[in-house]
């Protein structure tokens, strides 16, 4: 345990920052501007989604999952951004604003929840498209209701994991420079176990998305380029895969550096945290940088949908419409071709 004043909660540990540094970087405007950019991007995507015609079948299911992803990103930026901006306004003095650590525990759980949800939803979307493209007749028809049930399951799963430190497995602590709370990169078994659970679950989600999307794209390409093919994928099939691949690339670039850093830090032989709870200065700064990179995932996700819609793709590539007409992959002749040698 860390040595703290008895009047303070258990989330406080020594942080490598002086009062002068704290005052120099304690500007709420950067945090507020960053949050406003993300909120505006997600609101724009939600408005575009609201005006989309989902129809029925795979597209309605995909749009429901995508709406769940954008809504999650919006709420994540709203909740965590408000806390970060308030702490910057308080000159990063978390002890003065939250001595009992209630806000810190709330933000730590929110960081885990809103961090894992996009990765899990990305994997769920990849699985939905994988089954829809490669095995369209092996499952019940995709519906938006089933998709929203999947979103609900992801929320419950991520929320349950985020509550574990409040139940005794792992700890949330104030992180450098004092504007946010996150899981503790300590050497205690609970900290290591919880950190590994978070990083491994996120990494597996990204890896699963990569695998399933690769197979789905390869299947679409095989159908499109097959010489004997008389039918082509509909443009909506290609549109959904382009958007899904874009979401996967954004999640990989934004989140994998942080997840790998957490794994390396927790598994290395020499602990990076002293018995008093102080992290190495380089470790604290690296964690902050990787966290900021990961936050861009919530800002870029909505732009993947906004920019990779059919209407935009047609303007960028006029042949997109003429090349990708015809019936869906879900017709029996196409399925026979997909299941062929």
Swiss-Prot record:
Any Pfam family hit: 7tm_1
Phosphoserine modified-residue sites: 328
GO molecular function, one term: thromboxane receptor activity
KW Disulfide bond (keyword) present: yes
Extracellular side, ranges: 1-29, 87-105, 171-191, 269-287
InterPro entries to which the protein is assigned, alphabetical: GPCR_Rhodpsn, GPCR_Rhodpsn_7TM, Prostanoid_rcpt, Thbox_rcpt
Sequence ranges on the Cytoplasmic membrane side: 53-65, 128-147, 218-244, 310-341
Keyword annotations: Cell membrane, Disulfide bond, G-protein coupled receptor, Glycoprotein, Membrane, Phosphoprotein, Receptor, Transducer, Transmembrane, Transmembrane helix
Purpose: Receptor for thromboxane A2 (TXA2), a potent stimulator of platelet aggregation. The activity of this receptor is mediated by a G-protein that activates a phosphatidylinositol-calcium second messenger system. In the kidney, the binding of TXA2 to glomerular TP receptors causes intense vasoconstriction. Activates phospholipase C and adenylyl cyclase.
Protein name as it appears in the record: Thromboxane A2 receptor
């Amino acid at each position: 345990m860390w040595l703290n004043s008895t009047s303070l909660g258990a989330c406080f540990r020594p942080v490598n920052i002086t009062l002068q540094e704290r005052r120099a970087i304690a500007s709420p405007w950067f945090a507020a501007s960053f949050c406003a950019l993300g909120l505006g991007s997600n609101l724009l995507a939600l408005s575009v989604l609201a005006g989309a015609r989902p129809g029925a079948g795979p597209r309605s299911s995909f749009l429901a999952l995508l709406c769940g992803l954008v809504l999650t990103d919006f709420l994540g930026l709203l909740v965590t951004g408000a806390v970060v901006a308030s702490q910057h306004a308080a000159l990063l003095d978390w002890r003065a604003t939250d001595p009992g650590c209630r806000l810190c525990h709330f933000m730590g759980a929110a960081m885990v929840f809103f961090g894992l949800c996009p990765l899990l939803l990305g994997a769920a979307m990849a699985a939905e498209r994988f089954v829809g493209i490669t095995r369209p007749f092996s499952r019940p028809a995709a519906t938006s209701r089933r998709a929203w049930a999947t979103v609900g399951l992801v929320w419950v799963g991520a929320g349950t994991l985020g509550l574990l430190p409040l139940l005794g497995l792992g700890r949330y602590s104030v992180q450098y420079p004092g504007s946010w709370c996150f899981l503790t990169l300590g050497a205690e078994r609970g900290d290591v176990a919880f950190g590994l659970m978070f990083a491994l679950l996120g990494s597996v989600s990204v890896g699963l998305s990569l695998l399933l999307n690769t197979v789905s794209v390869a299947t679409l390409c095989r159908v499109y380029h097959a010489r004997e093919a008389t039918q082509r994928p509909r443009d909506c099939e290609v549109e959904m895969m382009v958007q899904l691949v874009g979401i996967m690339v954004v999640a990989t670039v934004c989140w994998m550096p942080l997840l790998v850093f957490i794994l390396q830090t927790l598994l290395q032989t020499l602990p990076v945290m002293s018995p008093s709870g102080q992290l190495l200065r380089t470790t604290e700064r690296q964690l902050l940088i990787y966290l900021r990179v990961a936050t861009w995932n919530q800002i870029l996700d909505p732009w993947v949908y906004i920019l990779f819609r059919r209407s935009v793709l047609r303007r960028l590539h006029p042949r997109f419409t003429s090349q990708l007409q015809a019936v869906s992959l879900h017709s029996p002749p196409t399925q026979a071709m997909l299941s062929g040698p």
